[in-house]
Amino acid sequence: MRNAAIQHIEAKFLRQDVTVFNTGDSVRVHWKVKEGEKERVQAFEGIVIRKTKGNHRATFTVRKLSFGVGVERVFPLHSPRYEKIEVLSRGDVNRKRLFYLRALKGKAARVDVIEEPKPSKKAASAS
């Protein structure tokens, strides 16, 4: 069990607007990049291959292919440096860590997509 004083201090630094996503989801992370005195937002889009827990130390790893080369980036979940995390599609995977995607190429490296239920026409017209 962690010390209550440490938990109280850490709670101040946790983000309240964290997007819910899981391993296998396709996400777009809008990350603030500081270049000199200017600050701009850079988007990084890929598949979440790992999530770690740990209050303010929680991280997630996103993998994408850029010009045929695999690029992975680790993001702190509670960092003030990102603007938002967009979930583009939900992935249907049976594992917590998808490191096996590193060895796969082409169509084999795809993750099955969960189809989100669309509202029926009757329900849409009734409201």
From Swiss-Prot:
Cite the GO molecular-function annotations of the record: structural constituent of ribosome
Q: Which HAMAP family match?
A: Ribosomal_bL19
Q: Identify the species of origin.
A: Myxococcus xanthus (strain DK1622)
Q: Which domain of life is it from?
A: Bacteria
| Name this protein carries in UniProt | Large ribosomal subunit protein bL19
A Gene Ontology BP annotation from the UniProt entry: translation
| GO cellular component terms, A-Z | cytosolic large ribosomal subunit
Keyword flag Ribosomal protein: yes
Which terms are listed as keywords in the entry? Answer: Ribonucleoprotein, Ribosomal protein
Q: Which PANTHER family match?
A: LARGE RIBOSOMAL SUBUNIT PROTEIN BL19M, RIBOSOMAL PROTEIN L19
InterPro entries per record: Ribosomal_bL19, Ribosomal_bL19_CS, Ribosomal_bL19_sf, Translation_prot_SH3-like_sf
Which residues are in coiled coils? none
> Matching Pfam families, A to Z?
Ribosomal_L19
The transmembrane segments are: none
| Function in brief | This protein is located at the 30S-50S ribosomal subunit interface and may play a role in the structure and function of the aminoacyl-tRNA binding site.
| Family (UniProt) | Belongs to the bacterial ribosomal protein bL19 family.
